[in-house]
Amino acid sequence: MRLSDLRGRTVAVWGAGREGRAAVIAIAAHGPADLVAVDDSANFLALPWEGPLAEAAPLVTGEEGFARLAAAEVVVRSPGVPNTHPWLVELRGRGVTVTQGSALWMADHARRTVGVTGSKGKSTTSSLISHLLTAVDRPNVFGGNIGVPLLDLPDADLYVLELSSYQCADLTDSPRVAVVTALFPEHLDAHGGEREYYRDKLNLLAHGPQTIVVNGADPRLAAELGDRPAVRAGSPDTTHVAPGPDGTPWFHLGDRPLFPRAVLPLVGRHNEGNLCVALAVLAALGVDVVARADALAVAVAGFQGLAHRLTEIADPSGLTFVDDTLATSPYAAMHAIDAYEGRPVTVIVGGADRGLDYAPLREHLAEREITVLGIPDSGQRIVATLAGLPRVRAEVVDDLVAAVRRARELTPADGVVLLSPAAPSYGRFRNFEHRSEVFAEAVRDTAGHPAR
C-alpha cells in the first residue's frame, strides 16, 4: 500500500508522537476522505496538537479513540503500538487494514533503499554502510530507527535505514538490499513470543529484495534462511577476516586482501562481523571494494562507533570502564564480554526483568574466569542462574553506583569493568541514556577508590 492509495479513504493514525505526526502530515497531502489521530498512551498530549496537525486531523482518545480506529478503512499505527495490544488484536479480527508509516514510505522508495535490521548490530552496521558509501562517492541519506520518521526523510537517490522489528512487521515491500545482522530472542512481550518476533524481524526479507546480506556466522539466521539465496558475510567466498600479506588478520573479499583488521577501531569479533556485512552491502551495490580498498581503509579508521556501545571511559586507576548500556539481552552481553577476552573482566548485569532465559549466558561463561555483579531487578536472578560455575564470582549489589564501587574493589588494575546489563533500563532509570549517565557519574565519583 502506497500513500497515494489512501486518497478518498477513511484513515486513522494511531499514535501522536513523532511517527504519528509525520504520518498525519504525509497522509493529509494525499486527500483522504477522513483523517483522525488517536492516542491511547500514558503521555497523552505530552506535545501540543495544534496548527497544521489539528487542521489535518482531530485528536481523540479513550473509548472514542477505539471507535474511530474501528470505523476506519485503514489504520496507520506508530511502531510503538505492540502487536499484543488488545485494540490491535480486535481491529485485525474485524478485518481492518493496519499498516505503518514505514510501510507506506517503503512502498515508494524500496528500490533506492538499503534496509538493516538485527537483534544486535543494526545501528553500527547501518552507520558503517552509510559512512563507507559516502567515502566512495555514493551520497546517501541515513535514517530509520534513529529518531527521524521515514516519512520525514528528504528525497535522495539512495537511503540507508536502520529498521527495528516493529518497523519491519507491517512492510509489504522489501528494500533493494535487505540486511540482517543477528537474530536472537528480544522484545518478546511486544511481539507475542519468539516465533512472532522472528517472523516480524524477517518480514524485511519477505517481499522480493534484490539482494539479501546476512551475518553468515549467526546460527539462528542460518536456520531461518535455510537454503534461501543470500550473501553470507564472514564466509570465505565473500567478505571475511583471515591472515593477510603480513600474517596478521586482514579483511578480505574472497581471496583478495583489503586492509588490516587493526584499521578498525572497534573492539570485538562481532564488530568484525558488522564490518564484513557492511562491505558485502557495498559490493552488492556495485562498489568495487578491492579497487577502493585504500579509501575504505581510511574511512574505517575514522569510524569511532556509536555511543553506549562498548564506549570506553578513561580512568586514572588503569581500569578500563566500558559503557555498553544498550546490551539489553544475554546474547548482547555475551558479545561484549567476548570483546575483552584475555583481560580480567567484571561485568555489571541487571535491569528490568522481562523473564528472559539466562541459561545461554550461564553456558557461555561455564569455562570463563569472570566477576559478575547483579543489580536490580533481574540481577539477582542472573546471579542465581550462574551459581555453581567454578570460575565465576557472582554477587548481588544494591544498585549501579554500588556496583561500580564494588567493581573497583574486585577488578585487577589492568582489568575491565563492563556495564553490559543484559536487560532494559526502564523502571530504575528514565531511559538507557539515564543509566549511562549514572554509570559515568559513578565512575567519576569513585575515581579515588583504589583498584585491587
UniProtKB/Swiss-Prot annotation:
Predominant place of localization: cytoplasm
Any one GO molecular function term: UDP-N-acetylmuramoylalanine-D-glutamate ligase activity
Residues involved in ATP binding: 118-124
UniProt keyword annotations, A-Z: ATP-binding, Cell cycle, Cell division, Cell shape, Cell wall biogenesis/degradation, Cytoplasm, Ligase, Nucleotide-binding, Peptidoglycan synthesis
Metabolic or biological pathway: Cell wall biogenesis; peptidoglycan biosynthesis
GO biological process, one term: regulation of cell shape
Cited function: Cell wall formation. Catalyzes the addition of L-glutamate to the nucleotide precursor UDP-N-acetylmuramoyl-L-alanine.
Name of the featured protein: UDP-N-acetylmuramoyl-L-alanine--L-glutamate ligase
Organism name: Micromonospora sp. (strain ATCC 39149 / NRRL 15099 / SCC 1413)
